[in-house]
Every structure is written in C-alpha cells, then in structure tokens.
Amino acid sequence: MQLVIAAVGHKMPAWIENGFGEYAKRMPPDCRIHLKEIKPVERSGSKTAETAMALERAKIEAAVPKGARIIALDEHGKDVTSVQLAQLLTQWQQDGRDVTFVIGGADGLDPDFKKKADMLIRISSLTLPHGMVRVMLAEQLYRAWSITQNHPYHRV
C-alpha cells in the first residue's frame, strides 16, 4: 500500500521538509509516505476563493493515483484518535488500495472535492500552517503504524 500526501503549497521552509522527511523515512518499505506538492493558484483581485479552489481541485485530482482512497483534511472533518487512525491503517492495508491524504490551499478544499472524498478528517481544532499539517500528518501516520506493530514509539 502506498500512502500519498497531496498538499497544495510549495517552497516550504527547511524545518518543515526535515520534519516531514524524518517521519517519512521511518516508515517501512511496504507503507511508505510519498509527498506530492501542488503549486497553489495565484490569488489576484480577479480570482475569487471559489475560483482558486476549483482550479486547485483539478490539480489535486491529477495528483491522486487512480483508484486511491481519498482522505481529505478539513477543519470540519471527523476527529480521529491515533488509535483509530491505526485501526483505519490496518483496514486500508487489508483492502490493498492506495491512500491519498489531501491538504488544501489557503482557502481550503473545493466543496465538490470534499463531497467526493471517501472520508474527511481533521488534524486539530486549531488553525495550523499548512506546512505544519504535513509534519503532523506524517508523524501521526508513523504513530499509527507503530501502534499496529506494538512498537514502543507510541505509549498509552
């Protein structure tokens, strides 16, 4: 199973890239995390947030591997604990479909894209920088994997 994080945004600071890379490299070969950066649509006076989200939607859809399960990160998504994420990871590994986590741009994700997603989850009730969400998601995926393996990284 391949885990993909499709994230709108590019040119992240080194500390974001290093943090993400640290957790991504800890994952086993059969459960690697791959990052697909999506260049955001430039905001200008003539473009509404809705227009920008629709244009980004097309780029996001192009980045999602065919047949992948889509998990959209959204502030109104379901709260998921680390243990629940581990249970989901186990289910996903058993069905063999790749999983793509989608992090939207500055205005969020297009409403039609969210309707199409297999699941909406949120990382936090707090508003976070999108780069930080990449790091936190990679850490939580590593934690979920460690829970499934009874690895000592996760302590209850």
Curated annotation (Swiss-Prot):
EC number: 2.1.1.177
Subunit structure: Homodimer.
HAMAP family in UniProt: 23SrRNA_methyltr_H
Keywords attached to this entry: Cytoplasm, Methyltransferase, rRNA processing, S-adenosyl-L-methionine, Transferase
Functional note: Specifically methylates the pseudouridine at position 1915 (m3Psi1915) in 23S rRNA.
Protein name per the record: Ribosomal RNA large subunit methyltransferase H
SUPFAM superfamilies: alpha/beta knot
